[in-house]
């Protein structure tokens, strides 16, 4: 890609989506010896989706909370991401994604400067962005939420916290085999 766009800045990012909802994220909790811990929750089946973009080399992240996943919203997420990172004629981003239907459809609108690279089917272990969810779920773990908007608010707060944790994110997502800048 650097040869094809000589003189342009090139960055390598990864993107994935996670579904969160009123069905709770349960985590272990501390309890006194001999006492059974109790994690209260309310079960529900409304969902929201967190789109996570990560640059493993630096630990930079970009987040979007959207109501669903589909080609139209993925195209919108790509546009917003391209604006955020300044992708265009002079800056190109190779974005690693899985082969979800909304990533591969012919209707996907890919902004100038964004280039999609698809992982092999059924290989989430190769996706650095997949490792983000353990961090984002901390904001909603063991929480009791009445409405999906409460989860979105908690997610938003957690994502803002993570913006300053680039070292932690880099350590979690920058696989030893992930290409590095020369």
Regions found by a protein language model. Name each.
Residues 21-23, 103-105, 126-128:
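Short catalytic/ligand-binding loop motif for oxyanion handling, primarily in non-cytosolic enzymes
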Residues 35-43, 112-131:
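RNase H-like polynucleotidyl transferase catalytic core
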Residues 105-113:
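Short, aromatic/basic amphipathic alpha-helical patches
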Residues 1-79, 175-176:
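Extended, low-complexity cationic-aromatic segments
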Residues 8-12, 129-182:
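C-terminal anion-handling pockets and recognition modules
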Residues 13-15, 93-97, 117-120:
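Short beta-strand segments
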Residues 10, 91, 112-115:
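Short glycine-/polar-rich loops that comprise or flank the Walker A/P-loop
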Residues 78, 89-103, 127:
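Acidic/histidine-rich, metal-coordinating catalytic segments
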């Amino acid at each position: 890609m650097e040869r094809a766009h000589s003189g342009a800045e090139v960055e390598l990012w990864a993107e994935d989506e996670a579904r969160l909802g009123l069905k709770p994220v349960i985590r272990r909790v501390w309890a006194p010896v001999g006492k059974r811990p109790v994690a209260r929750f309310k079960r529900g089946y409304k969902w929201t989706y967190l789109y996570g973009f990560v640059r493993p080399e630096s630990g930079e992240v970009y987040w979007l909370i959207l109501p669903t996943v589909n080609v139209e919203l993925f195209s919108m997420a790509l546009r917003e991401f391209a604006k955020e990172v300044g992708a265009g004629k002079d800056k190109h981003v190779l974005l690693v994604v899985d082969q979800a239907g909304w990533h591969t459809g012919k209707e996907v609108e890919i902004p100038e400067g964004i280039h999609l690279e698809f992982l092999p089917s059924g290989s989430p272990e190769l996706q650095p962005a997949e490792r983000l969810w353990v961090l984002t779920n901390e904001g909603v773990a063991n929480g009791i939420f009445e409405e999906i908007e409460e989860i979105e608010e908690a997610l938003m707060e957690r994502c803002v916290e993570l913006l300053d944790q680039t070292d932690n994110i880099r350590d979690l997502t920058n696989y030893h085999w992930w290409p590095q800048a020369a």
